[in-house]
Amino acid sequence: MKKYLLLTFSLIFISCNTEVKTENLESDFSSFFKNGDIMTSATQDPLGNVFSYPTGEASITSQVKVWEPGFKSPWHYHPYTGVAYVVQGELTVNYDTETALDATGDEKTIVLSETYKAGDKAFLGVANTWHLSENKGSEDLIFIVSWLGEKDKPLAVLSE
């Protein structure tokens, strides 16, 4: 429901602001937008793995995720990396760096946890490592992720 309200208010805001000025454009919007890089020349994910582009036909999928407090994903892994940015709240990612990818039915164990907060720099999602993600905070978590995948290939593989 909150996603739909956010989308509705965004559309109302956009439709009410259809007039475009070309003079002093930067100063007109300086109170709304701050310029700055959220990721620059990233070559490694948070675990130190060097990322590479897919070998097949490249395909980018961008998603906005809104998770309520207490939400926890199932164990899964992504065959590809993605650029992620937390807009609101904090995202905790729990990694199992020891279980093989073909062990889909095996029990997973948290070996390492990383927490990313709103306002932090963007980060590369870890590819080919079992993990579960959660919102341990007291407010909705909103984050954006753009997956650098392959056409017609899954973005995630779930544990059984």
Predicted regions span which residues?
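Sec-dependent N-terminal signal peptides
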Residues: 4-14
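A short, N-terminal "cap"/entry segment at the start of jelly-roll beta-barrel domains
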Residues: 16-64, 94, 104-106, 113-115, ...
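Extracellular/periplasmic catalytic domains that process cell-envelope and extracellular macromolecules
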Residues: 55, 77, 85, 108, ...
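Conserved short histidine dyad/triad with adjacent acidic residue
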Residues: 61-78, 82-83, 115-117, 126-127
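Active-site-proximal beta-strand/loop segments in catalytic clefts of secreted hydrolases
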Residues: 67, 78, 89, 96, ...
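Glycine- and acidic-residue-biased ligand/ion/polar-headgroup-sensing regions
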Residues: 80-109
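Ligand-binding loop in jelly-roll beta-barrel domains
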Residues: 100, 117-120, 126-154
